[in-house]
C-alpha cells in the first residue's frame, strides 16, 4: 500500500545534505488548489528570504539528481552492516521492528544498569557524538546519506565500549575483591566509589 497526502511539508535537513531550517512543500493530486497555496504563501512568508538556505536546497536537489541513486545505495549498505554489527551488544539493545525507518538507530537501555540520560552524556563527553533525542529508556541516533564509514565505526565503537563498561560494573559486585595499591589501579574495577574531601562530609 502507498500512503498519500494532499500536502506534505518535508524537512530536507533531517536526512539530506542541506542546511538546518530548509524544507520543501509538496503538493499531490487535484484536491489542492495550487493558486490558493501560492497566494497564501505570498501573504505569510518572509519578503526577505534567506538565499543561503535556498541555495542549500538547490545544491541538495542537484546532488540527488546527479549522485543520489549511487549515494543512497552506498548509504543503505553501510547502514545495514552497521545495524548487523550491533547485534552482539549484551546490555544495550538495538530496537528493531517490521515497519520502521531504518535510518533511525534506537538504542534501548531497558536491560542495562544505565539510564538513557547517562548514555547520552557518555556518548557526548567521551566520544563527541551527538544523539538526536533522549527519552524514557532509549536514545535515538539519526543517520543520513552524508554519514561516512568512519562515522558509523565511531558510533559502533562507542556503543560497544560503553556496553563493556556496563558489564564490568555489574560483575564488580560478584567478583572476589583483591587489595591493590592505587598506582596499580589502571584497567581494574574499583570495588567501591572513591571521593575527594573536603568540601562536603564523607
Name each model-derived stretch.
Residues 87-202:
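Conserved C-terminal alpha-helix-loop-beta "cap" of PLP-dependent enzymes
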Residues 10-14, 43-50, 68-75, 108-113, ...:
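Hydrophobic alpha-helical scaffolding
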Residues 2-3, 15-19, 33, 64, ...:
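Solvent-exposed alpha-helices and their adjacent loops that cap or buttress functional pockets
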Residues 14-15, 30-32, 59-60, 110-112, ...:
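Short, glycine-/Ser/Thr-/acidic-enriched flexible segments
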Residues 3, 11, 26, 40, ...:
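Generic, well-ordered alpha-helical scaffold segments in large soluble proteins
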